[in-house]
Amino acid sequence: MSLTYMNMFMAFTISLLGLLMYRSHMMSSLLCLEGMMLSLFVMMTMAILNTHLTLASMIPIILLVFAACEAALGLSLLVMVSTTYGMDYVQNLNLLQC
């Protein structure tokens, strides 16, 4: 395993640990999710470039599309929770009702 792959795996692991440890605030959870998606994007791009697999070259772009949708939904939930309750705790997501 090369050094760059190990660095990206460590970035993913640290983001996952941050997501598991700091679950109280929604903004920190969203930042950890974005770090995970960024490290996955870089790992997939490096793997495709190293293997010269041209048929799978669209997969990182599709991952970025899903990451953008996830970020938009997360930020809209953050705005909704913070305007309704005045704080961005994850536990307030259980109180949201239609």
Swiss-Prot record:
The UniProt entry's GO biological process terms, in alphabetical order, are:
ATP synthesis coupled electron transport
Q: What is the documented function of this protein? A: Core subunit of the mitochondrial membrane respiratory chain NADH dehydrogenase (Complex I) which catalyzes electron transfer from NADH through the respiratory chain, using ubiquinone as an electron acceptor. Part of the enzyme membrane arm which is embedded in the lipid bilayer and involved in proton translocation.
**Gene from which this protein is expressed:** MT-ND4L
Which reaction(s) does its UniProt entry say it catalyses? Answer: a ubiquinone + NADH + 5 H(+)(in) = a ubiquinol + NAD(+) + 4 H(+)(out)
- Give the main EC class: translocase
User: How does the record describe its quaternary structure?
Assistant: Core subunit of respiratory chain NADH dehydrogenase (Complex I) which is composed of 45 different subunits.
The UniProt record lists the EC number as 7.1.1.2
State the family named in the UniProt similarity comment for this chain: Belongs to the complex I subunit 4L family.
Q: What name has this protein been given in UniProt?
A: NADH-ubiquinone oxidoreductase chain 4L
Membrane-spanning residues: 1-21, 29-49, 61-81
Identify the InterPro entries for this entry.
NADH_UbQ_OxRdtase_chain4L/K (IPR001133), NUOK/Mnh_C1-like (IPR039428)
Which Pfam families is this protein grouped with? Oxidored_q2 (PF00420)
Tell me which UniProt keywords the record has, alphabetically.
Electron transport, Membrane, Mitochondrion, Mitochondrion inner membrane, NAD, Respiratory chain, Translocase, Transmembrane, Transmembrane helix, Transport, Ubiquinone
* Principal cellular location given in the protein's record: mitochondrion
GO MF, one term, reads: NADH dehydrogenase (ubiquinone) activity
Q: Name a single GO cellular component.
A: respiratory chain complex I
Q: Where in the cell is it found?
A: Mitochondrion inner membrane
| Domain of life the protein comes from | Eukaryota
Statement: the UniProt record of this protein carries the keyword Mitochondrion: yes
Q: How does it sit in the membrane?
A: Multi-pass membrane protein
